[in-house]
Amino acid sequence: MIVYVSRRGDTLLSVARRFHLPPEELARYNALTDPTRLVPGLALAIPAPSGEGRREIVVAACADAALFPLSAGEAMRYATFLCSLSCRMTGEGLLLPPADGELVRAARADGAAPLLCVANLAGNGAFSADLAHRVLTDGCVQDTFFAQLLSVLETRGYCGAYLYLMYLYPFDRERLGAFLRRAAALLHERGFFLLSAAPPRESGAVGKAHDYALHAECADWVVLTTYDWGNAAGEPQPVSPLGAVRRVLDRAVEQIPREKILLGVSNHACSWTLPWRLGQEASLMSNTAAVNLAVAAGAAVHFDEGAAASRFRYRDDAGVLHELWFEDLRSFLSRFALVREYGLGGMSLWTVNAPNPPLMSAQEELFTAAKLI
């Protein structure tokens, strides 16, 4: 694959001619909805043979069953695990799994082991430290939780669980450790896989409840959720800045065996209104939608080399100014390079509901997804 960055004066037709491709194929390969327009700064994927050997890795693809099928079906061919988002828990230890029967069946048909992603999400969809605290501390509630979890896994065709416990109280660190040990014992005894999510340590109080070494002791693979610096509640910045991701990896490999680490890779973009004020929420969209928005708005794209992320500014229909950060092909290739450089076990894609042909093509060119079922 070749990466071509569009310049002022380029058109899709001129770029296609340069690389001897039909313009329709180039547009399809890059998920461009308007093949008649192009803006400067876009990283375009150009099909070409790669001289690099493919390495087998573990790929955990996360998908929201409510949005299936979209592109999740295609992603399963390139995935080891298909993590179904998300099963909520209650303060009584009950589980509220998603209606994902079709997703689970499709995953199995493509050789992707379906996992149930269980998160401490409250009824409003936000992470709740109080909810997690109750499950971690009340023995009866926790007994109910694990009885429910095993029953759901066994009756709905899952191959295991992905525990996504986030924004916990720092003082629940030891309780989380005991919970993970119990989860590992119960699931492994029954032949289930266990993945666990661990936030970046530099995320302050958010990460203090998590012991990387203990995650490694309990889980088959540990997912580093390195895709939340630029988020809906914060100020404009890259979603997954390369320098910050590298710092997280430098610490993580000291406590987690490299082959157990799955690097979180974001497939979403954030758009903030300007001027930004504390309390404003950004809107989320797919990276592909961000590219097409830049084209529609006629906005030049600027690539931040240090962050390996792209941004542009545009005005919406009401004339409001926005700044949008997204991941392009250069971003994905830089993350894939980290997987190789650090000798990681693989990566976790958050999420695969929105189509992203350049991402899938680059992954297929460099890696082979291990198949465990």
Segments and roles (model prediction):
Residues 91-98, 173-296:
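Substrate-binding surface in catalytic domains of secreted glycosidases
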Residues 57-63, 80-84, 114-118, 161-163, ...:
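Hydrophobic faces of well-ordered beta-strands that scaffold small-molecule active sites
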Residues 63-77, 138-154, 204-213, 327-340:
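Short, acidic/polar
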Residues 49-148:
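Glycan-recognition patch characteristic of GH18 chitinases/ENGases
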Residues 117-132, 267-335, 364-373:
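Glycan-binding loop/region signatures in secreted carbohydrate-active enzymes
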Residues 83, 144-175, 221-235, 348:
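Active-site groove signature of glycoside hydrolases
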Residues 1-21:
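Primarily a LysM-type cell-wall glycan-binding module
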Residues 335-373:
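Acidic/aromatic/glycine-rich contiguous surface patches that form carbohydrate-binding/processing clefts
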